[in-house]
Amino acid sequence: MSSLSFKDVMSAVPTSVSLISCVEGDKVYGCTISSLVSLDISDTSSKIVFMLKKESLVGKTIITNKSFSINVLSAEQEYLARYYSNVRSPDTIGENKWDILNDKFAHVKNARIVLDCEHHDIFDEYPANIYVARVVDSSVNKALLPLIYESRNFINLNK
């Protein structure tokens, strides 16, 4: 291996930044991910894959509630990516950043893409848990550019 660690090499791969959100009662749990990948893009059984830390409260909420949203952040939402990348208490549903659908999907206002998902499977034999989810609905705002994460920095394509 080169002088760079594998972690350094992989951090140089540019990725979109997403915020996973789960509703439980009057609370919204959220965390930032950069590991979102499509697994099946068919219209009848669209599936995505992502990873979360084993001790993730959001992961536990996904398994319990089954329904959640993945919000691909827009270029101007770096503040949300930073906020949700740290440990914090859940938000209350009434907070202005959320649009709640059917009491189970929390959409970030002005996200570039929103995927409403149902938990399908989990693979827990790795250092991080790998989640498979079925996409039940989706939307994209093509007028917004995505927020990108590369080499441990956020990149705003608008600047």
Regions found by a protein language model. Give the residues of each.
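Basic, polyanion-binding surface patches
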Residues: 1-159
